[in-house]
């Protein structure tokens, strides 16, 4: 493994780990950064699956106590059963639309301009959602109803557009639908588990011929890096939301999106090959 390839794997692992669970769009950042450092082609598809799986495993580890409790109580406790049902309800809209439209979306929307526009629009919506008056009906994830779960699941489908952000769509959706900031964030993390594992399994099977033994060192660098930085990001976000709003992320989205649009408009960066990830 050449040092430059290892460096590319490290950088993309950092980007995935830091952005996957922040409401700033990991896919959008991956598309932009991968193009800037020249990491693309067939190997990039397999690599992306690996680092996304690492990020979700970090969340599984962080919430292992809650997961164990739900599994243990599932046969007899109504609260654990309702939580599990809510996750399944929120999970299925993305499954249905993903199967129907994933390839079409990847072909037509995986480009920096779509990412930039989605970043800006999502940032504006995030600011609006944070500034409106909130009526909190569900303080904790265990207080959610199946209707709350269904609405958040539908909101998650918006993240099929690169630049929208899966966590951003589910968290802001949760706030708009009456969840507390803590409940919306935690449910977004839990919903990420079946959603991202399902996507990784589907993509892994679809691109199974791209996984080659000679790429294992590159995958290992990306996997470890993504896992470590995802753990850092998850813990930091859970601590951050205790005393802060999501406005800082909204302004970051808007600024980053406008920067991409400016580099495109004034031909400062050639984005013509971006999106091959």
Swiss-Prot record:
Keywords: Antibiotic resistance, Cell inner membrane, Cell membrane, Cell shape, Cell wall biogenesis/degradation, Hydrolase, Membrane, Peptidoglycan synthesis, Transmembrane, Transmembrane helix. It catalyses: di-trans,octa-cis-undecaprenyl diphosphate + H2O = di-trans,octa-cis-undecaprenyl phosphate + phosphate + H(+). It holds the Pfam family BacA. One of its GO terms (molecular function) is undecaprenyl-diphosphatase activity. It is found in: Cell inner membrane. InterPro entries: UppP. It is a multi-pass membrane protein. NCBIfam families: PRK00281.1-2, PRK00281.1-4, undec_PP_bacA. HAMAP family: Undec_diphosphatase. PANTHER family: UNDECAPRENYL-DIPHOSPHATASE. Belongs to the UppP family. Bacitracin is thought to be involved in the inhibition of peptidoglycan synthesis by sequestering undecaprenyl diphosphate, thereby reducing the pool of lipid carrier available. This is Undecaprenyl-diphosphatase.
């Amino acid at each position: 493994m050449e040092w430059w390839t290892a460096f590319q794997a490290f950088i993309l692992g950092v980007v995935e780990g830091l952005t996957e669970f922040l409401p700033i769009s990991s896919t959008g950042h991956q598309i932009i950064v991968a193009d800037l450092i020249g990491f693309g082609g067939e190997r990039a598809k397999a690599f992306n699956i690996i680092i996304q799986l690492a990020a979700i495993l970090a969340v599984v580890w962080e919430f292992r106590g809650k997961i164990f409790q739900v599994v243990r109580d599932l046969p007899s406790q109504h609260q654990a059963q309702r939580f599990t049902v809510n996750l399944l309800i929120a999970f299925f809209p993305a499954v249905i639309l993903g199967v129907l439209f994933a390839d079409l979306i990847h072909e037509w929307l995986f480009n920096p301009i779509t990412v930039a526009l989605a970043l800006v629009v999502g940032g504006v919506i995030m600011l609006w959602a944070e500034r409106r008056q909130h009526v909190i009906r569900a303080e904790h994830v265990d207080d959610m109803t199946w209707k709350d779960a269904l609405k958040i699941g539908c909101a998650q489908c918006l993240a099929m557009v690169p630049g929208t952000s899966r966590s951003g769509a589910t968290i802001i959706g949760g706030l708009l639908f009456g969840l507390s900031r803590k409940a919306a964030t935690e449910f977004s993390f839990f919903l990420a588990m079946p959603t991202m594992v399902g996507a990784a399994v589907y993509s892994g099977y679809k691109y199974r011929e791209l996984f080659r033994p000679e790429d294992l060192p590159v995958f290992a660098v990306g996997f470890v890096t993504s896992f470590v930085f995802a753990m850092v990001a998850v813990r930091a976000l859970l601590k951050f939301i205790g005393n802060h709003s999501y406005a800082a992320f909204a302004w970051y989205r808007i600024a980053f999106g406008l920067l991409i649009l400016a580099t495109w408009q004034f031909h400062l960066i050639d984005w013509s090959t971006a999106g091959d990830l």
